[in-house]
């Protein structure tokens, strides 16, 4: 038997993990083993909301060292993280300033300023990326306007996965799928857009040419002295998750469900027409030149904050209590930017219900019910928008990522959307990360080949829509007339 051992470092906004994948060539089987899991989260430092990148790097190294201590020969390593955030370095490779998180308020008002000065349509035609107030375009403008004293010291700007790859290898890389999330990459040239960079205040010399997934960045030297290739995977975690989504045919949509919910479809061409602009659709880069035509939905961030504020530790018990409540008694628009990072999420949800003359969710289960129903209704809205954009309905929706373990939300989604839902794999970002590594090692031919492996090895669950459910009736009778606010458009 021929085996390959690949390690995926998968960093999300709330947690990170180092996973070992074992691929058996002859039977095309893939098994995952968690080596190290650790928490991630927002910190407050000098008035900014930041990431603790030193702690994350230590956790990554700890996980890699654990694999080596077991005597396992690692064939390659890949790193994926969330998008838009970056680390600045000087000529010696030392950090300049703080690793500020996208939920910081420093970008307030800058997206509107950019639209007024450059033109909303022109920005969209150049980048193809949705307007979100924390895009790197606006973060860099905030930095260069508010901290000009840092500019003379900056030599490089590395997005998060590229920064951690640099820390392991000493080599710099700017991976394409994650670079596209910045709203700074020109959709026609696949290179940094000089006009957008100029507005941001950044120097083009801070960036190297974006590279597509599949190249070897450099090597990490393990404690035993072996040099292990570090591969540029599809380093935006959603790009990796989509690679591992077992999409079957052109009528399949995906929903990457976690802190954020990303709903979309794959396309060989981007959608940058007026309809896409009005709907705030994004065209992020994917593997093999494909586009991830999708829309951001606030996702389980709302629930994560409620769990934290109410000190809830038993999520299955909460979901069971939630399931017993009637549907759609309280609904909000999860994509209202009031929910990006409020002081108190519970109070913000209650205020939104109060302002729309609804009953007020008070108990833990009522708050969770409000979130689940509201997400499912928004999923239905977005799926309809995407179908209209491309001129063809979808026949199935693949929900991947940690959120796909929530059977109640999966069923609500199926019922609200009126579509068959296939849940799994859970560790989609990790698997997609591994998939690119296996292609780089010449074990697999392409993404479609890898998806066949996922389909046969992953644990998938199907949810059939129930047209007689409460939420299905709500969609048919009431929700069709509801107006939803775009997320930060």
UniProtKB/Swiss-Prot annotation:
Binding site for substrate: 83, 236-238, 296
Keyword Nucleotide-binding among UniProt keywords: yes
Positions annotated to bind ATP: 13-17, 259, 304, 402
One Pfam family here: FGGY_C
InterPro entries in the cross-refs: ATPase_NBD, FGGY_C, FGGY_N, Rhamnulokinase
Active-site residue numbers: 237 (proton acceptor)
Reactions catalysed, as given in the entry: L-rhamnulose + ATP = L-rhamnulose 1-phosphate + ADP + H(+)
BP GO annotations: glycerol metabolic process; rhamnose catabolic process
One Gene Ontology cellular component: cytosol
This protein's record includes keyword Lyase: no
Disulfide bonds: 68-222, 353-370, 413-417
Keywords, in A-Z order: ATP-binding, Disulfide bond, Kinase, Magnesium, Nucleotide-binding, Rhamnose metabolism, Transferase
Pathway where it operates: Carbohydrate degradation; L-rhamnose degradation; glycerone phosphate from L-rhamnose: step 2/3
GO MF annotation list: ATP binding; glycerol kinase activity; rhamnulokinase activity
Cofactors: Mg(2+)
E.C. number(s) listed in UniProt: 2.7.1.5
Protein family per UniProt: Belongs to the rhamnulokinase family.
Subunit text: Monomer.
Entry function: Involved in the catabolism of L-rhamnose (6-deoxy-L-mannose). Catalyzes the transfer of the gamma-phosphate group from ATP to the 1-hydroxyl group of L-rhamnulose to yield L-rhamnulose 1-phosphate.
Protein name (database record): Rhamnulokinase
Protein source organism: Escherichia coli O7:K1 (strain IAI39 / ExPEC)
Origin organism lineage: Bacteria, Pseudomonadati, Pseudomonadota, Gammaproteobacteria, Enterobacterales
């Amino acid at each position: 038997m021929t085996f390959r051992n690949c390690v995926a470092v998968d960093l999300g906004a709330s947690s990170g993990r180092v996973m070992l994948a074992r691929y058996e060539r002859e039977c095309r089987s893939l098994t995952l083993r968690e080596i190290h899991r650790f928490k991630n989260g927002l910190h407050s430092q000098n008035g900014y909301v930041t990431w603790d990148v030193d702690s994350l790097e230590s956790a990554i190294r700890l996980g890699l060292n654990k694999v080596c201590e077991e005597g396992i020969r690692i064939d390659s390593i890949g790193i994926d993280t969330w998008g838009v955030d970056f680390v600045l370095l000087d000529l010696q490779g030392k950090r300049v300033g703080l690793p500020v998180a996208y939920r910081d308020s420093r970008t307030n008002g800058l997206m509107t300023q950019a639209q007024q000065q450059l033109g909303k349509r022109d920005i969209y035609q150049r980048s193809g990326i949705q307007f979100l107030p924390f895009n790197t375009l606006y973060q860099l403008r905030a930095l260069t306007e508010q901290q000009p004293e840092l500019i003379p010291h900056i030599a490089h700007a590395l997005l998060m996965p590229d920064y951690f790859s640099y820390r392991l290898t000493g080599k710099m890389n700017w991976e394409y799928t994650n670079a596209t999330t910045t709203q700074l990459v020109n959709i026609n040239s696949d290179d940094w857009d000089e006009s957008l960079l100029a507005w941001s205040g950044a120097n083009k010399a801070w960036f190297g040419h974006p590279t597509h997934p599949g190249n070897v960045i450099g090597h990490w030297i393990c404690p035993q002295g072996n040099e292990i290739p570090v591969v540029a995977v599809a380093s935006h975690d959603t790009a990796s998750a989509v690679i591992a989504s077992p999409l079957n045919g052109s009528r399949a949509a995906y929903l990457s469900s976690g802190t954020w919910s990303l709903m979309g479809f794959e396309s060989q061409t981007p959608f940058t027409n007026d309809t896409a602009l009005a709907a705030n659709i994004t065209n992020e880069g994917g593997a093999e030149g494909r586009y991830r035509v999708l829309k951001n939905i606030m996702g389980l961030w709302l629930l994560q904050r409620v769990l934290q504020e109410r000190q809830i530790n038993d999520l299955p018990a909460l979901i069971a209590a939630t399931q017993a409540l009637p549907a759609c008694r309280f609904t909000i628009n999860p994509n209202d930017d009031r929910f990006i990072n409020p002081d108190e999420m519970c109070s913000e949800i209650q205020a939104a219900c109060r302002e729309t003359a609804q009953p007020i969710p008070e108990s833990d289960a009522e708050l969770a019910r409000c979130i689940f129903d509201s997400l499912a209704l928004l999923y239905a809205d977005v799926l309809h928008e995407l179908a209209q954009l491309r001129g063809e309905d979808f026949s199935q929706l693949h929900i991947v990522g940690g959120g796909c373990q929530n059977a109640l939300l999966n069923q609500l989604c199926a019922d609200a959307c009126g579509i068959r839902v296939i849940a799994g794999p859970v560790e989609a970002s990790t698997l997609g990360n591994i998939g690119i590594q296996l292609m780089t090692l010449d074990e697999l031919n392409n993404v479609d080949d890898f998806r066949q492996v996922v389909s046969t090895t992953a644990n998938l669950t199907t949810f059939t829509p129930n047209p007689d459910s409460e939420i299905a009736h709500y969609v048919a009778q009431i929700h069709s007339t509801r107006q939803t606010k775009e997320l930060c458009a």
